[in-house]
UniProtKB/Swiss-Prot annotation:
It comes from Pyrobaculum aerophilum (strain ATCC 51768 / DSM 7523 / JCM 9630 / CIP 104966 / NBRC 100827 / IM2). The lineage of its organism: Archaea, Thermoproteota, Thermoprotei, Thermoproteales, Thermoproteaceae. Keywords: Ribonucleoprotein, Ribosomal protein, RNA-binding, rRNA-binding, tRNA-binding. This is Large ribosomal subunit protein uL5. NCBIfam families: PRK04219.1 (NF003258). The gene is rpl5. One of its GO terms (cellular component) is cytosolic large ribosomal subunit. GO terms for biological process: translation.
Length: 179
C-alpha cells in the first residue's frame, strides 16, 4: 500500500497539491444494545481504531428511538490508516464511484452494501452482515488556518478543493472510474 504522503495530486504550486485529510466510516444501526455492540466490534476489527458512538438527534416514536440514545458507530481514520482502508473500500465497490457522490467542497461519500465485500473479510454468523458509509475529505495545505481555534482566519477560494479537482484526484491518483 502506498503511504499517505505519496497519494498527492500536484498542480503547479506546492500549496495547490491535494491530499486525503481523513476517512470517516459510519455504520447506522438504528438501535442500541447488542446490535450496536456487534457493529462497534466489527468496525474496530475492520479499521483497527476505536469507534465512537453516535447518538440520536431527536426522538422518533415510530422507530422506537429516543433523543440521546446511541444508534450508530463511526470511526475517523487519518494518514496511512485512512489510505489503507480507503483502498480496500474502493476494491469493494469495484473502483467505481458515481459522479453524484462528490460535493462542491471536495468531499466524497459512497456506501458499501455488505462488509463481506471488503477484501480479506469472511462472513461470521455471530456478527451478521452490515453495510457502511465511507466519507473521504480531500484538502489542500493551509486549510488549518480556517479550522484552528486560535488566530482563525479566512482562506481564499483557491485553497478549497472543488468538485472537478476531487474527481481528477480520484481518477489520476487512486485509479477510480467516475461514472
Amino acid at each position: 500500500m502506498p503511504s499517505w504522503k505519496e497519494l498527492v495530486l500536484v498542480k503547479g504550486h506546492p500549496m495547490q497539491r491535494i491530499y486525503i485529510e481523513k476517512v470517516v466510516v459510519n455504520i447506522g444501526v438504528g438501535a442500541s444494545g447488542e446490535k450496536l455492540e456487534k457493529a462497534a466490534g466489527l468496525l474496530k476489527e475492520l479499521t483497527g481504531a476505536e469507534p465512537s458512538r453516535r447518538r440520536a438527534k431527536k426522538s422518533i416514536k415510530d422507530f422506537g428511538i429516543r433523543k440521546g440514545e446511541p444508534i450508530g458507530v463511526a470511526v475517523t481514520l487519518r494518514r496511512d490508516q485512512a489510505v489503507n482502508f480507503l483502498m480496500r473500500a474502493l476494491q469493494a465497490v469495484n473502483n467505481r464511484v458515481k459522479k453524484t457522490s462528490f460535493d462542491d467542497r471536495g468531499n466524497v461519500c459512497f456506501g458499501i452494501k455488505e462488509h463481506i465485500l471488503l477484501p480479506g473479510v469472511k462472513y461470521d454468523p455471530a456478527v451478521g452482515i452490515w453495510g457502511m458509509d465511507v466519507c473521504v475529505k480531500l484538502a489542500k495545505p493551509g486549510l488549518r488556518v480556517q479550522l484552528r481555534r486560535r488566530r482563525r482566519s479566512k482562506v481564499g477560494k483557491r485553497q478549497l478543493v472543488t468538485k472537478e479537482e476531487a474527481i481528477e484526484f480520484f481518477q489520476k491518483v487512486l485509479g477510480v472510474q467516475v461514472d
